[in-house]
Amino acid sequence: MQYDHILVRYGELTLKSGNRNTFINQLKSNIKYALIPLTGYKVNANRDRMYVEITEDADAEEIMKRISKVFGVHSVSPVVKVEKNIDQIKSSAVKLARDIDAPGVTFKVDAKRSDKGFPYDTFALQQELGGEILSNIEHLTVDVKNPDYKLLVEIRSDAAYLYSRVIKGAGGLPVGTGGKTLLMLSGGIDSPVAGIEVMKRGVTIEAIHFHSPPFTSEEAKQKVIDLTRIMAETTGEIKLHLVPFTDIQKMIHKKVPENLTMTSTRRMMLKIADRFARQIDAKALVNGENLGQVASQTLGSMYAINAVTNLPILRPLLTLDKDEIIIKAKEIGTFDTSIQPFEDCCTIFTPKNPKTNPRLDKVESFEAGTDFDAMIEEAVANIETLTISKHTNTKKEFEDLL
């Protein structure tokens, strides 16, 4: 069957009556971005649905695959659009049914009619189409309770639409409708997943990464660039901010007892992220912390670390099991990159016996003897920024940076 349109159903946008047009326009823009550089389509949107016209030579399957990954899309279907003429509708229904024709296969016609002026009511239309299919196709039988396939027909104001497939979308809200956050992006499994999870709620992210050459390698930096590109595949450009962290990290290990260095390191990172977030007008920080997963992610550690900022910290992975996070990482395509064996600055100086319940007053007293604020200001001033998109040649970006 040659389809001529792809039907895109909105998710939670239907609940946003006051801002619906803003959400729809953003979703339309995001879908157009996701479809680059494909050809043979035209995106049309209204308050209830979005229809993507496709030409005969368009790659319909690839178009649907890409659209289904865009946040804000509830589901997609390849559809045939015909005039609201019963004979044309019958003819198209039979053609659709031939695609599923096989011995023992059952079907059901499910009709919806938003155009109440159409001469057939829902029940009558279902009977007409079901009878036409049974008269023309040998093997199919009707099962209204548990069919193998549903043939769906929508009678709308402009035309009739027929389809038999419904492909689940990514859900959530369109990226760009929920404000800006700053993602603390390591090279590990968790933080890219956290970034995707908040983007699903319509939030735009910029990412900040701490690197400590020569203790961290250039390959570790490249890995973070690659992770950013993967996250940007369906959401548009993402700015990646690279923080020189070597001097601060060396000073921490010189001035702070070993079992508190992890806590102090995280505090300095958070101070830098806090200051930079305010510069770019980000309203919250995001990280991949998971309660109890490591020493720095116990409640006691979080309390001591969080004391340096009053910005909201979003932790979308807080209560997930590691296996659940890994599944999500594989689904979004970051897992294989995340497990590349290049250490980041969080792992190179890991103490043997880190404090899991550090006292805030003790951490502050050890830090007070050093002018970390001046070092933080210098680190923020020397941040390097890359703008990454799915079209970015990340290897070239990396070489240009060097």
Curated annotation (Swiss-Prot):
Pfam families: ThiI (PF02568), ThiI_fer (PF22025), THUMP (PF02926). One of its GO terms (molecular function) is CCA tRNA nucleotidyltransferase activity. Its EC number is 2.8.1.4. One of its GO terms (cellular component) is cytosol. One of its GO terms (biological process) is tRNA 4-thiouridine biosynthesis. Keywords: ATP-binding, Cytoplasm, Nucleotide-binding, RNA-binding, Thiamine biosynthesis, Transferase, tRNA-binding. ATP binds at M184, L185, H209, F210, R266, G288, Q297. It is found in: Cytoplasm. InterPro entries: Rossmann-like_a/b/a_fold, ThiI_AANH, ThiI_fer, ThiI_N, THUMP_dom, THUMP_ThiI, tRNA_STrfase, tRNA_sulfurtransferase_ThiI. It comes from the Bacteria. Its main location: cytoplasm. NCBIfam families: tRNA uracil 4-sulfurtransferase ThiI (TIGR00342). Catalyzes the ATP-dependent transfer of a sulfur to tRNA to produce 4-thiouridine in position 8 of tRNAs, which functions as a near-UV photosensor. Also catalyzes the transfer of sulfur to the sulfur carrier protein ThiS, forming ThiS-thiocarboxylate. This is a step in the synthesis of thiazole, in the thiamine biosynthesis pathway. The sulfur is donated as persulfide by IscS. PANTHER family: TRNA SULFURTRANSFERASE (PTHR43209:SF1). Belongs to the ThiI family. This is Probable tRNA sulfurtransferase.
